[in-house]
Design a protein with these regions (language model features):
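N-terminal presequence-like segments and the immediate start of the first folded domain
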Residues: 1-56, 60-73, 79-128
């Protein structure tokens, strides 16, 4: 089985990593942050705007691998502000069903790669 490295044109070009690696039906998605396709941070200081951009980036990553958000089986969420949990849950509900949610780990941390980032989500998906 070959390994495919994918960097969607709708995402900011990565430096030193791939946004998506697909091996067979398994898709590994690098931590997605609130950057648009031009590399600009979206929603500085605005948790909802940042979570929304992260889910848009996850959608783009999965689409590039032939999948969608319903194919996610595992997420790791890194957040810098505990008070952003409600905003995260609210925005996540717009993108993901609660019928069969993926397994998930949420980690509160003191910071991410850019001090303006409030959230980062990495995922594993199984696509048909």
């Amino acid at each position: 089985m070959s390994v495919e490295y994918i960097n969607p044109s709708t995402s900011a070009p990565p430096r030193g990593y791939s946004h998506v690696v697909k091996h067979g039906n398994t898709v590994y998605i690098a931590g997605q942050v609130a950057r648009d396709r031009d590399g600009k941070t979206v929603g500085v200081g605005d948790a909802k705007a940042q979570v929304d951009q992260v889910f848009k980036n996850l959608e783009a990553a999965l689409a590039a691998a032939g999948g969608n958000l319903s194919h996610i089986v595992k997420t790791n969420i890194f957040m810098t502000h505990r008070e952003d949990l409600a905003a995260y849950r609210e925005v996540r509900a717009k993108y993901m069903s609660n019928d069969n949610p993926p397994v998930s780990t949420l980690i509160l941390c003191s910071g991410l790669a850019d001090p303006d980032f409030r959230i980062e989500i990495e995922a594993i998906a199984i696509v048909p």
